[in-house]
């Protein structure tokens, strides 16, 4: 059983000095830079962009539900 390289096996949280474990805005245990496209534009809607402070990809408020 191999542990995730970003995860502290005791706490199941990111290791000291790391930002994240996984997510569309997480790469190599770090948050992607603000403005990085995490969901490309489609139709008449703009790209969804990483914030630089979260591993989540925030939804563009102009996307259809």
Swiss-Prot record:
<keyword id="KW-1015">Disulfide bond</keyword>
<protein>
    <recommendedName>
        <fullName>Disintegrin CC8B</fullName>
    </recommendedName>
</protein>
<comment type="function">
    <text>Inhibits integrins alpha-IIb/beta-3 (ITGA2B/ITGB3), alpha-V/beta-3 (ITGAV/ITGB3), and alpha-5/beta-1 (ITGA5/ITGB1).</text>
</comment>
<comment type="similarity">
    <text>Belongs to the disintegrin family. Dimeric disintegrin subfamily.</text>
</comment>
<comment type="subunit">
    <text>Heterodimer with CC8A; disulfide-linked.</text>
</comment>
<feature type="disulfide bond">
    <location>
        <begin position="20"/>
        <end position="26"/>
    </location>
</feature>
<keyword id="KW-1217">Cell adhesion impairing toxin</keyword>
<dbReference type="InterPro" id="IPR036436">
    <property type="entry name" value="Disintegrin_dom_sf"/>
</dbReference>
<keyword id="KW-0130">Cell adhesion</keyword>
<feature type="short sequence motif" description="Cell attachment site; atypical (WGD)">
    <location>
        <begin position="42"/>
        <end position="44"/>
    </location>
</feature>
<feature type="disulfide bond">
    <location>
        <begin position="38"/>
        <end position="57"/>
    </location>
</feature>
<dbReference type="GO" id="GO:0090729">
    <property type="term" value="F:toxin activity"/>
</dbReference>
<feature type="domain" description="Disintegrin">
    <location>
        <begin position="1"/>
        <end position="65"/>
    </location>
</feature>
<dbReference type="Pfam" id="PF00200">
    <property type="entry name" value="Disintegrin"/>
</dbReference>
<dbReference type="InterPro" id="IPR001762">
    <property type="entry name" value="Disintegrin_dom"/>
</dbReference>
<dbReference type="GO" id="GO:0005576">
    <property type="term" value="C:extracellular region"/>
</dbReference>
<keyword id="KW-0800">Toxin</keyword>
<feature type="disulfide bond">
    <location>
        <begin position="6"/>
        <end position="29"/>
    </location>
</feature>
<dbReference type="GO" id="GO:0007155">
    <property type="term" value="P:cell adhesion"/>
</dbReference>
<feature type="disulfide bond">
    <location>
        <begin position="25"/>
        <end position="50"/>
    </location>
</feature>
<keyword id="KW-0964">Secreted</keyword>
